[in-house]
Amino acid sequence: MPYLENSESSPDPTPLDAFHCLVQDINKVLGPSSGLDSDDVDPMDIQKLMEDYTSNESEWERYAFGDAGRAYTRNLVDEGNGKCNLLILVWSPGKGSAIHDHANAHCVMKVLKGSLRETLYGWPESDKVQKGEPSPLTVTRDKVYKEGQVTYMSDKLGLHKISNPDPTNFAISLHLYTPPNAAHYGFSLFDEKTGKSRHVKQSVLFSRKGHKL
């Protein structure tokens, strides 16, 4: 299976299986708009599409390349004509992301396999950070999402980190980012103890449309 190290991609799936129908439907919802910032697109529509999809590993495994030496890999599925990034992330056992923002974009995440823990934080107090004073981040939610569950995230809700709580098995998730701001302009990582941030370029893709880079 591709999310195991050094494995080969399986043959192209039937174009109209349920997963690729989901990809098509997401593009239809985004339509002529510039992404979920547009008034004519409701994030709930994307959430509903993802909730309605029943994960079938044979449909998406060709995109799910993993590397146990990394916390996670980013595997591009679709770019939505420049309006979004649709990615499959493969989370190594017991590892996770740093605390980060979403570069004024929207993120909808569905767990395809395993489970993922989301820890949500409030924003640091900007006046303290600007003065060089610590502003520790406060946890506002800590939740584990199981296979099939969907969640939504944006900067209006705060900051978060995602981790795979399973010490032995990979976890797989589908993420829609729209507009694809982080891919173009980068995003910020935050220190939990001080609240200080640093801007970074988006992590490189591990694979693109089923082909390992």
Swiss-Prot record:
Concerning Gene3D superfamilies, the annotation shows:
Jelly Rolls (2.60.120.10)
Q: Where does Fe cation bind?
A: 100, 102, 160
* Cofactor dependency: Fe cation
Q: What is its EC number?
A: 1.13.11.20
This enzyme catalyses: L-cysteine + O2 = 3-sulfino-L-alanine + H(+)
Could you tell me which InterPro entries the record lists for this protein? CDO_1, RmlC-like_jellyroll, RmlC_Cupin_sf
What protein name does the entry list? Cysteine dioxygenase
Gene encoding this polypeptide? CDO1
| Enzyme class, spelled out | oxidoreductase
- Cross-link 3'-(S-cysteinyl)-tyrosine (Cys-Tyr) maps to 107-177
Q: How many cofactors are bound and how?
A: Binds 1 Fe cation per subunit.
The GO molecular function terms of this record are: cysteine dioxygenase activity; ferrous iron binding
The record describes its post-translational modification as: The thioether cross-link between Cys-107 and Tyr-177 plays a structural role through stabilizing the Fe(2+) ion, and prevents the production of highly damaging free hydroxyl radicals by holding the oxygen radical via hydroxyl hydrogen.
Which family is annotated?
Answer: Belongs to the cysteine dioxygenase family.
The record's keywords, sorted A to Z, are: Dioxygenase, Iron, Metal-binding, Oxidoreductase, Thioether bond
> Pfam families under this entry?
CDO_I
**GO biological process annotations for this chain's record?**
L-cysteine catabolic process
The transmembrane residues are: none
Covalent S-S links between cysteines: none
